Each structure stands twice: as structure tokens, then as C-alpha cells.
């Protein structure tokens, strides 16, 4: 996963992390500004061998620290973030779906599962 509700978003992390850590992440994950650091990081997660890959919506949307859900041991501003109308577009959904196909993470339909069972 790129994170949980208890840590900053990808974009928030890139703005606040130590420069050496950011440099290392960019090199290790081969990130570039054109694609977006969030998309490169998410692709690394989706491309791993784990059974599950979890990416918060704030990372898909490329939101900074203002999208953080929770700061542990604090009161007042936690659990306030909500997606607003128009943020989740059909173009974004298609982009996510395409990546799910590329990284073999797209959920199979009932028909596809049945076809696999009969092929065995």
C-alpha cells in the first residue's frame, strides 16, 4: 500500500520528507515529475507480487497533506477529508482501470471466473 489513514499522502510526503529520502525514492522507484510522483509510486505498489495492493483515494487524486485523514494522538481535524463532486472523473476511472489491467489487478467477472473453472 502507499499508505494508511495514519500517514501523509504520497504528495504530502514528497513535500515534507527529508531531501535524501525523496532523492532515494525518486531513484529507486524511477519516478518523474511528468508522470506524477503519485502515479509512479502507485504503479510500484500495483506491480508488486502481493495479493493485495491498497491505494487511498487521496493518492489517486494526487492530493497533498490537506487530504490526510488522521494524525495520530491529535484531536479536532481528523477524519474530515471528503472527495468533492467532480474530483472522480470518468477519465480518472479509465486510467485506474487501465493500470489494473496492466498489473493484473482487475477483478474478474463471474463469467471470466466460470470460464477459468471449466478450462481446468
Report each predicted region and the residues it spans.
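Catalytic cores of glycan-processing enzymes that make or break glycosidic bonds
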Residues: 1-120
Amino acid at each position: 500500500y502507499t499508505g494508511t489513514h495514519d500517514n501523509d499522502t504520497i504528495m504530502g510526503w514528497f513535500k515534507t520528507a527529508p531531501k535524501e529520502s525523496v532523492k532515494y525514492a525518486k531513484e529507486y522507484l524511477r519516478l518523474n515529475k511528468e508522470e506524477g510522483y503519485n502515479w509512479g509510486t502507485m504503479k510500484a505498489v500495483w506491480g508488486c507480487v502481493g495479493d493485495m495492493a491498497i491505494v487511498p483515494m487521496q493518492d489517486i487524486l494526487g492530493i497533498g497533506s490537506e487530504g490526510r485523514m488522521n494524525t495520530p494522538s491529535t484531536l479536532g481535524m481528523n477524519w474530515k477529508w471528503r472527495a468533492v463532486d467532480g474530483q472522480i472523473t470518468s477519465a480518472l476511472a479509465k486510467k485506474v482501470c487501465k493500470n489494473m489491467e496492466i498489473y493484473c489487478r482487475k477483478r474478474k467477472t463471474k463469467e471470466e471466473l466460470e470460464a477459468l473453472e471449466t478450462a481446468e
